[in-house]
Amino acid sequence: MTTLTAQQIACVYAWLAQLFSRELDDEQLTQIASAQMAEWFSLLKSEPPLVAAVNELENCIATLTVRDDARLELAADFCGLFLMTDKQAALPYASAYKQDEQEIKRLLVEAGMETSGNFNEPADHLAIYLELLSHLHFSLGEGTVPARRIDSLRQKTLTALWQWLPEFVARCRQYDSFGFYAALSQLLLVLVECDHQNR
């Protein structure tokens, strides 16, 4: 990626972690359709590989604003996709895709982090990977830890996530009939791919 700073990428990962970790509340629903968010999307579109994914997400958000009971409908989508059995869902856990659920724990230890007691999900949840990537990008921007060490850990995290993210995104696209989480996951996929290539 060329136009986004490490801090901006960190913010995108943190934002995505929040949206994949729990159902949207009324405040978040208002925020994603705000002028401030439109500016943020505009900034993301300064990165050419992200343009199509951001446009798709913006279209879903525009449709969402006229959807009756939008919050309840999105909550049902979230529940159906991420909290049910894996038959017609996109479970947000590395272990659901036959990946080593201990890998993220090792990466967190290496980063000097641990999961919060407030987050009642297994450590191999997608949001934990995204929080770790956010933390690493913020650390890159601060310059307090050697960049080579942070970058090595960032690459390991991206590689571990890439082992199962494409299948997760494919399942989101297959089973999310409204398309908000499908669009969100597509944006994440493109972001991770760009981040991974930016060695």
From Swiss-Prot:
GO terms for biological process: protein complex oligomerization; protein folding. It comes from the Bacteria. Keywords: Chaperone, Cytoplasm. One of its GO terms (cellular component) is cytoplasm. InterPro entries: Chaperone_TorD, DMSO/NO3_reduct_chaperone, HscB_C_sf, TorD-like_sf, TorD/DmsD_chaperones. It is found in: Cytoplasm. Pfam families: Nitrate_red_del (PF02613). Its main location: cytoplasm. The keyword Cytoplasm applies. Involved in the biogenesis of TorA. Acts on TorA before the insertion of the molybdenum cofactor and, as a result, probably favors a conformation of the apoenzyme that is competent for acquiring the cofactor. Belongs to the TorD/DmsD family. TorD subfamily. This is Chaperone protein TorD. It comes from Escherichia coli (strain ATCC 8739 / DSM 1576 / NBRC 3972 / NCIMB 8545 / WDCM 00012 / Crooks). The lineage of its organism: Bacteria, Pseudomonadati, Pseudomonadota, Gammaproteobacteria, Enterobacterales. The gene is torD.
